[in-house]
Amino acid sequence: MKSGGIRNYFLQYFIFIISAAASITMVAEDNVEYFKYGDFNSWITRQIPESRILGGKIKTLYEVGPTQTIEGAKAYKNLDGSPWATSNVYAKVVGISKGSCAVVPDTRSAGNKCAKLTTIMERCKAIGIINVDVVVAGSMFLGEMIEPVSSTDNPYSKMDMGIPFTKRPKALCFDYKLEIPVDGKHIYSSGFGKKKILPGQESAEVMVFLQRRWEDSSGRLYAKRVGTGRIRFDKSTKGWVNKYQLPIMYGDITKKTEYKPYMGLIPSERSYHARNSKGKIVPVEEVGWDNETATPTHIIVMVSAASGDAYTGTLGLTLRIDNVGTVY
């Protein structure tokens, strides 16, 4: 090969290497916008005195927000613009105060925390008055929990699900670590009636829905689904999975190969709830799929140590989550 040919060959090779490196850099430099407090390094500690009839102990609950301690049986409202709510609740039923905690901060490394979500059996016992066991799956979502909770009826009616959001991300990103107990049973226990062993294996779940919502003159809320991402994890991980991306598909996704039945529209009988313009918590009825170019008004993100109906789960199933954001 002549010297000129050699130079051209190496020049082309050099350009190829630079181009490949540039393409790799572009992938690595996805624009990620993290939700406020989405690194889970800052937590609020709540000290709830439970009723004497239940033993009168102090129950510790945690919320995601500015570091501080709140003492007393007080209804919690999100602080400092934190968009995060959890399944941790202060309940007051027929005058009896009780706390439940299935989401806690956990140390991931020195100076670095994450959220730890576990499915637990919450027991409430007062001799001669009450004796109930309730399966509680540790869950987190964008929105607000309405406290104090006064019953186990329709748990979604106690949750203001979703926050205003008008962007169109291509994915939800997060770090996660999952531990599923070997031979763990899938249990239903609502506190009423007998416990049941359900068929199948439980899994953890992460979902992101983009909705375009509107309100009618009577205060009813409706929505069309703009974007969908939903996944169920049914295998324990070998340590942390970092920078996982859950793709968001736009428009009607029912004909896509990636579609699974659990990604469908929310049935009206299981509608999530939100606060309308009158300040009332009402169902948000999903009435159809929106145009794939539509602009959303709200985003729903939920992370859970279970994927089934309320009051079901596998005790001990533990999902750790960290660094939650949207990818563009």
Predicted regions and their residues:
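Extended, low-complexity, turn-rich repeat/linker tracts enriched in Gly/Pro/Ser/Thr and Asp/Glu
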Residues: L178-K185, K196-Q201, A310
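A contiguous catalytic/ligand-binding core that recognizes phosphate-bearing ligands
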Residues: M161-T166, Y188-K194
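Bacterial Sec-dependent N-terminal signal peptides
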Residues: M1-Y34
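A short beta-strand element within beta-rich, extracytoplasmic domains
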Residues: R168-L178
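Short, solvent-exposed secondary-structure capping/transition elements
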Residues: P181-Y188, S217-G219
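Aromatic (Trp/Tyr/Phe) and Gly/Pro-enriched flexible surface segments
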Residues: E29-P169, P199-D252, K260-A306, Y311-V327
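Residue-level marker of positions within ordered structural domains that often coincide
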Residues: I15, S19, T45, K177-E179, ...
